[in-house]
Amino acid sequence: YWHGYLPILRPLLIFFNVSQIRKILLFVFVILFVWLIKLLKEKLGIATSIIFAISLIIQGYFFVSYSLESAPVFMVMMISSIILLERIDKIKNLYLYIFIIACITNFVDYLTVPLITLGVPLLIYILYKQKNDNKLKCKDYIKIIVKASFVWIIGYGITWLSKWIIYDFIYNEGLIKSAISQVRYRSESYNEYKTATIQQIVGILLINNLEYIFFMFDFAIIVLLMMARKYQVKMKKISVYFQENLPIFLISLMPFVWYFALGNHTIMHLRFIYRHMLIFLIGILICLKNIWIIEKKKKSVTN
């Protein structure tokens, strides 16, 4: 394992103890949370910002600040999302940006939930383009998702491989051979220390998140009923809904691809790997939100 967060953590330990560092991290997490939600409200609307806020809270965002190993990847996710929203119209090459995010993620992350640094910014980018760019079609968004995912994998993989090569070149300890065997081991779905299979665990993660989704759906229905006097709610046409939400749904499935690809890692580290479902939770709630068209009722004119 590569502890890329240590160059930052060690200087901090000179001046602060672990408890104080956790308080600093919590403060940083709160600032990033408020900043991101504010930008989401401005760029994508209040409903989307609420979905992101509740999803982050449900997946234990603020508790992550107490984990020195898990906090860095969440900070990368939040900061990259904020920069994306701040400069979304000025970023000329999305794929270069995704590549840089992937490299930074691999450097600082302890193999916790790295996929959130791809899934969350990509959701934000697609949602923004759907709102502001009428020229792009469903197939265009799918191409963006596939290309961005491929670029992220390349950036993540190259950075990881370069660490092995540099270390092996300096110390000549056969690290590359050992690393390859570990990759094979981590991608297996069987583990001698666990009785649960990867399919069972993914099923549990799915069911747990569906509970949150149904709760949010019921809450949204109540809100809509309360708004019924001033607003009218329409269902979108199936074709329009499908075209709009297929890209979002595909991004939502990313955690399951990760779980099945790295079955052994998922089984062994369920205590934190469930946070990948943040991508699923946000994506599915966005899809549910997009079912409705909410319009302000026109006042009847009487003579």
Per-range role (PLM):
Residues 94-121, 144-157:
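Membrane-interface alpha helices of multi-pass inner-membrane proteins
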Residues 226-252:
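Membrane-interface helix-loop-helix junctions at transmembrane boundaries of multi-pass membrane enzymes
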Residues 7, 53-75, 102-107:
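Aromatic- and kink-enriched transmembrane "portal" helix at the membrane-lumen/periplasm boundary
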Residues 7-25:
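Juxtamembrane segments of multi-pass membrane glycosylation machinery
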